Amino acid sequence: MNLDDLFEQKGEVAKSVLEELEKVMGEYGYNIEHILMVDIIPDDSVRRAMNEINAAQRMQLASLYKGEAEKILQVKRAEAEAEAKYLGGVGVARQRQAITDGLRENILNFSHKVEGTSAKEVMDLIMITQYFDTIKDLGNSSKNTTVFIPHGPGHVRDIGEQIRNGLMESARAGINIERFCISP
């Protein structure tokens, strides 16, 4: 029996001691009724070794729990980040839809109120306005130190032509562009 078993089976040990004492002391006329085993006190070196073993086991268990807790934190952090990105994407999609709806409404209102203007002319005007807004935003950003932007009288027209050419190329390629266009 090892020391751990001795501590666990203290009652069994007391019973064995009682039986042995009854045998030995019975020869002298003594009758043992009960034996009280108060505590088992091992040698100091044995106690220190047992304490070190217990401490090492607790440290190992604590490390395991700490690792599991860190794993759970990382998973929750990743889930929160994924949810934030998803919600950010939903917000951007709604913002773009609102911009598209507003542009469509502005084009229709402007072309109905100002006679002789076509939807293309209104789109060109809106593109110029957005182009200047973009330049202003780039200039106001504190993160930008130098920005090279081709700027000239025909630059906005060139951008408009590039967009129209892209739409025509996609139409020739058979790509459905209706989902990208502003519908009245």
UniProtKB/Swiss-Prot annotation:
Q: What is the lineage of its organism?
A: Eukaryota, Viridiplantae, Streptophyta, Embryophyta, Tracheophyta
What InterPro entries does this protein's entry cite? Band7/mec-2_domain, Band_7, Band_7/SPFH_dom_sf
Record-linked Gene3D superfamilies: Band 7 domain (3.30.479.30)
Q: Which residues form a coiled coil?
A: none
Q: Which organism is it from?
A: Lupinus polyphyllus (Large-leaved lupine)
What is this protein identified as?
A: Protein PPLZ12
